[in-house]
Amino acid sequence: TKLRLGVYDRENLNPYDRVTEDDIDSPKAREICKELSRESIVLLKNENGALPLDKALKAEDIAIVGPLGDAWYQDWYGGTAPYRTTFLQGMEVLKQENITFADGLDRVVFRCDGKGLAVAEDGTLQMADEPDVFIKEYWGEGSYTFKSVRTGKYLGARLSESQGEKPKMGQIAADREEAFDWFVMEIFHVEPQEDGSVVLTNRFHYPVYKDAEGFFSFEQTEGIPITMEVVENGIEKAVAAVRGKKQVLLALGCNSVINAKEEIDRNTLELPEEQEMLLDRIAEVNPNTVLVLFTNYPYTLQKAMEKLPAIIMSATGSQD
């Protein structure tokens, strides 16, 4: 292959065999990336002239809702983008005004032994008088992530020193701005208990337990009961955001390193249950809804095909 590409040629016969740093993130490269982004969009359904959107629509007439509306997720084999543009950001650039947005995700607090759980200065999860609020996101098949509203960082079970300064193995901390690694330790499972509490387990199903230094999840032991209280209902907030709007854009999809890559096989092609619930409620309240699906793996969309007039799909990971 290298011979055919001209890598060993004395003369630069192949214009693509000597890429330099000057070619990285150049204006030409950015234009190519933008072109690829445009061409990757696939129209799956379009009835009653739902698309393209009416250019006369004002920003105040539009609502964007859904967990992928203002999120940007890197694919496992994708490059590190020099900048990131979310769907919401792109739409606001087009309209030159802010657009109503709701991610549809619950906000929750955790309590244990009569105390709240909060992120300490070093990022570790500790007992506190006032609990921190976390954004709860369900990715299907039992996989949750929890992001601190206050710090913007994800809870995770520390796996190595790369995740903090000499961390304790398995210590629960919020010290990463994205859930992205070979083993995504920001994944948690929630096991309801008979008394209404829950036991949290990490991605390997090791329960979260507590000792004098904080909370850990590194071995098969008895998990500590934790109360998880919803302090803001994400779906109801999204429903309120779409009432009376002329156009709703519902952004659903995946984080491609959660639930599907080399060491993980999905058991279903359905959207995560909470995304399906959001779709049901939004379609019921405002039928002028277009599904914008951001995904790097396939989904069955029977419910969306039945309830919504239009569906478009794009992969994740492009900077534009």
Predicted region positions:
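Active-site or pore-adjacent capping/gating segments
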Residues: 1-37, 292
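Gly-rich Lys/Arg/Thr-decorated short loops/hinges at beta-loop-alpha junctions or inter-strand turns
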Residues: 12-24, 67-75, 250-266, 306
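Loop/turn elements at helix/coil->beta-strand transitions in domains of secreted/extracellular proteins
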Residues: 39, 58-61, 96-99, 243-248, ...
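Short amphipathic alpha-helices and their capping/turn segments at secondary-structure boundaries
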Residues: 41-58, 231-247
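Solvent-exposed loop/turn segments at secondary-structure junctions
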Residues: 68-71, 105-108, 254-258, 295-300, ...
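Glycine- and acidic-residue-enriched helix-capping/strand-helix junction motifs
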Residues: 69-94, 260-273
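Lectin-like carbohydrate-binding module/patch detector with strong preference for beta-trefoil
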Residues: 103-245, 250, 262
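Catalytic cores of nucleophile-dependent amide-cleaving enzymes
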Residues: 271-319
